[in-house]
Amino acid sequence: MSTELIKTRAIYSGTGRRKCSVAQVRLVPGSGNLIINGIPGESYLQFSPNYLRVSYAPLQVLGLLNQYDIHVNARGGGLTGQADAIRLGVARALCSINPENRTTLKSEGYLTRDPRVKERKKYGLKKARKAPQFSKR
C-alpha cells in the first residue's frame, strides 16, 4: 500500500459576537480574500468601505493584510453587527497564530467584546424606555 503525502494547510479559527450576530472565522494562508457565507466580502458588505475597513482592521494593525484569506460563516443581526463580529473573530484567530499578537490587539481594543445589546421593551411603555405622554389633568 502506498502512502500518500497529504499537504496540510494551517487553518486558524476564532469566533466573534456583536449584538445578535455571530461570526465563525477561519484564517487560511493566502492572498487577502474575504469570503462571507460563500459570497465575496465586498458584495456581501454592500461595497461599504467602513464595513470592509472594520473587518480587515486587526490584520492591518499587524501588517498581515495580504497574507491570509478570511472565510466567515456569519449569521444573525445586521451588517454592522456582523462586521464587528468578524473583526473580533479575526483578532481571536490572529492570537491563536502567534500569542505575541495579543498585546498589540488588546491595546487597540480588538479583543474586547462589545457588551451593548438591544434593551427589551417593557409593558406599559411604548419602547424600552419611552413612556406614553403624561397628562397631569
Curated annotation (Swiss-Prot):
Region (Disordered): 106-137
Native source organism of the sequence: Pyropia yezoensis
Gene: rps9
Keyword match S-adenosyl-L-methionine: no
GO molecular function, one term: RNA binding
Protein name: Small ribosomal subunit protein uS9c
Signal peptide bounds: none
Residue stretches of biased makeup (Basic residues): 118-137
Protein family per UniProt: Belongs to the universal ribosomal protein uS9 family.
Lineage: Eukaryota, Rhodophyta, Bangiophyceae, Bangiales, Bangiaceae
